[in-house]
Amino acid sequence: MSIILWSFFLFFTIILSSLTNITTLASFSSLHADELNALKEIATTLGIKRLNLRDEDPCSSKTLKIIQEVDFVPNLDINNTIGCDCSFNNNTICRITELALKTMSLRGKLPPELTKLPYLKSIELCRNYLSGTIPMEWAKMAYLTSISVCANNLSGNLPAGLQNFKNLTFLGVEGNQFSGPIPDELGNLTSLTGLELASNKFTGILPGTLARLVNLERVRICDNNFTGIIPAYIGNWTRLQKLHLYASGLTGPIPDAVVRLENLLELSLSDTTGIKSFPNLSSKGLKRLILRNVGLSGPIPSYIWNLTDLKILDLSFNKLNGIVQGVQNPPKNIYLTGNLLSGNIESGGLLNSQSYIDLSYNNFSWSSSCQKGSTINTYQSSYSKNNLTGLPPCAVPANCKKYQRFLHINCGGEEVSIRNSLGKITYQTDNSRQTNAASNQQFDYWGVSNTGDFTDDNSDHDEYYTSTNLTLSGDYPDLYKTARRSALSLVYYAFCLENGNYNVKLHFMEIQFSDKEVYSRLGRRIFDVYVQGKLFLRDFNINKEANGNMKPVIKEINATVTNHMLEIRLYWAGKGTTLIPKRGNYGPLISAISLCHSQEPLCGVEKTKHHIKYPLILGASGALVTIVLLAVGIYARGIYRRDNNRRERDLRAQGLQTVCFSWRQLQTATNNFDQANKLGEGGFGSVFKGELSDGTIIAVKQLSSKSSQGNREFVNEIGMISGLNHPNLVKLYGCCVERDQLLLVYEYMENNSLALALFGQNSLKLDWAARQKICVGIARGLEFLHDGSAMRMVHRDIKTTNVLLDTDLNAKISDFGLARLHEAEHTHISTKVAGTIGYMAPEYALWGQLTEKADVYSFGVVAMEIVSGKSNTKQQGNADSVSLINWALTLQQTGDILEIVDRMLEGEFNRSEAVRMIKVALVCTNSSPSLRPTMSEAVKMLEGEIEITQVMSDPGIYGHDWSISKLRDIDTHSSSSTSGVTDQTTTTMKSSVSGCDLYPLYPESMILNSTVENSSSSL
């Protein structure tokens, strides 16, 4: 018996010892020394400043201990994960198989040193600020199956060497700056199951080699610039479950082979053309079907309502007609807005569901007692008109008791009061949290209609407002702490308005992309803005317009109200990033809205009441003196007011809400226009520095009494400047029209003019980054004048003295005294020449032909002066060089183009940016106007978004040397600067452009409504 017990004891001892040894081996397994050293190199390339590998083995902690910089902002979305296989060398050695460093704002490059982790299977580096491209060295990693580098600053072409990544099953490069065509070699990655190329700058047609990718299950190629039709070979991807093509650039029709894909769960296609008939989709398991703004016509096929798994159906902004009925189990989200659907929707059963349903902009009929559901959007859904066109009978009061002339809304926020020099303005609250995917909320004189859900965020509880706790700068920061947003379409409409002309101000600030998280700067929110059904802003990007996040930008437009309603629509056309700072962040966003009748100068200002006690005047003689004095005062005041009212009528005629300063205010601000405060001479007269009582520093332009311009030109300048708000235009605060004085009040620019910064005796030391920023800023300002403002405008005198610099060296264009409205129907205006020799385009100076291309020429000269630090008005280079531009052309031919770069930079400049700026300057100063780019194209060239067209030298009569010489002759021998041109204005009609708008937010349904109403009323 004892032998048996002893045997059992020995057996259990051996088993226990074995288990202890295994545990000991596992506990002492550690990362291979080579890979430990490799991590240090990888961290350096990624831009990690300090990496702690001493305290704990990475495979044990399953993370990298990174010591962040001081300004690092903690982020709950950070994913810092290391995956290891510790089965090597009898479970004592670990090898890294997975590396995830996501949402960390790393600023380095993709590390080729990852090849020193030979067992690596997965690379995840999303949401950083990494630059460069995908290293071809990674192809050596035999086990690599997944590359995810979304939301970075990677650029260039996708490398053709991708074919060497033979085992790759997932490639995700969404949200970068990749450009060029997709390489044919991508079709060799036949193991791919996931391919995400969205939100880049890819161009060209999709190569036919992609037909080989038969294992693909999900594809995202949205928000690119592809060309051609949707390829039929997508039908080869028989395992495909998710296909997202919105705003890709591809056009219809949808090939039959694609329609027959049976495993499709999600099909998203939007904002394109060529898809006229509804596809007969084979997949019965569809969960998401988006065919938005693609040109569909005819009725909605009945099989759609029988797809039991369908959760999201978006058929908005097409030409679908017919009746919607027989719907038993509708999808959770249905968007039918902007079609021609008709019938009595109340009898169809659709409204009895719990779905979110958008019926806006259709031709449905409603009873007078129609019920408004909290999840049903009925705005503009009926052809039954009432006194407020387009709203269902139950949606508005029978009659407007009072007509309003102004409205202020704090979008997404509480009631806010702001103060300006005239008094207090109150912005109404818009903080209702009842907004949903298909809602129409209505208040006393306005309403807001919302369409769409953020499908990418995988959440059933979307929020349609946002806010920030950060301290904001700029004027009236309280207006920008909140904002309302939408996933597709956001409409603000005002009703019971007095008819007439209105000034509409739209306030924007990007508060969802924070500069504190570096990767968030890469976010691009792009949407379109329509006012009264007309496209006002296409591809509007708040960040780009404001030159950064958390900066305000105001867009103004003049609109006409004829039916007591005004409508503002913001629409997402599928462009921009959708995954920064996280999935589901896209679509329009707006902070505040203000609209004011042109004959309402106070625009809702609440006047402060002053109570004045008048002393009792005793005695008849005292009363008589008082009466006489009053009579004289009234007479004098009448003369003054008559003159002042005339000027104010001129201002009102232009629909302005300019702040009027008193003479006493400006006299006090400038210390009685003390010469010590004189800044210089402007286009009309002297300019003085001043300080208002609230501490605001201003620049006051005192118009010369000898100026030939006078009141009309004064009003003209106010008319053009006051309606323009842009970060790169000098802001006009207001004016003064007292005591026969005409004064303009501008923001004060601390660093004076660009001319002084470049050529002055005490010139600023502008480094290359400042010069690049200044040049791009000028370009953006001109782009706005030409194409971004409500009225297109030619400046006519762009030069370095008319570019001012603020404290942060932001460039702002000044002196619009020479500007002329550029009517959209005129190709050129021949008028008196007014400008500066050395900056004027040849066709303008010699023949008086004025187009935007004259400003483009002047900008090219200024750009060359910025890069060179030299003035174009002085001879440069050798004796054969007539001008700075001519010298640059000579250097380009000899291959010494960088010799023109300012030596003050001492070689410290970005060579590629310098070459780009020089080439842009040269193409802008082409002697032929037709060969110059537009300012919009020039901006994209400067930012590297498009190629720079080759400069064509012209030895003929328009040649640069001949033109400059002739201009100097004119400057010497002519004082009138008219070049023999009369001041008669001659016009030539502009040729029409392609008529089809891809984003018809007023589709035929709305046009037909208007036509029917107008025709019936004329009978």
UniProtKB/Swiss-Prot annotation:
**Main EC class the enzyme belongs to:** transferase
Residues recorded as bearing Phosphoserine in the entry = 830
Q: Which SUPFAM superfamilies match?
A: L domain-like, Protein kinase-like (PK-like)
EC assignment: 2.7.11.1
The record's listing under InterPro entries reads: Kinase-like_dom_sf, Leu-rich_rpt, LRR_dom_sf, LRR_Rcpt-Like_S/T_Kinase, Malectin_dom, Prot_kinase_dom, Protein_kinase_ATP_BS, Ser-Thr/Tyr_kinase_cat_dom
What does the entry list under GO cellular component?
plasma membrane
Q: Which residues carry this modification: Phosphotyrosine?
A: 746, 844
Cleaved signal peptide residues: 1-19
Q: Which residues are glycosylated?
A: 21, 79, 90, 153, 167, 188, 225, 236, 280, 306, 363, 387, 469, 558
Residue numbers annotated as active site: 797 (proton acceptor)
Q: Which ranges of this chain reside in the Extracellular compartment per its record?
A: 20-615
- TM segment ranges: 616-636
Task: Tell me which residues make up the Protein kinase domain.
Answer: 673-946
Q: Which reaction does it catalyse?
A: L-seryl-[protein] + ATP = O-phospho-L-seryl-[protein] + ADP + H(+); L-threonyl-[protein] + ATP = O-phospho-L-threonyl-[protein] + ADP + H(+)
Q: Which membrane topology describes this protein? A: Single-pass type I membrane protein
Q: Where does ATP bind?
A: 679-687, 701
Pfam families registered for this protein in UniProt:
LRR_1, Malectin, PK_Tyr_Ser-Thr
Q: Which UniProt keywords apply?
A: ATP-binding, Cell membrane, Glycoprotein, Kinase, Leucine-rich repeat, Membrane, Nucleotide-binding, Phosphoprotein, Receptor, Repeat, Serine/threonine-protein kinase, Signal, Transferase, Transmembrane, Transmembrane helix
Record-given protein name: Probable LRR receptor-like serine/threonine-protein kinase At1g29720
Q: Which gene encodes it?
A: RFK1
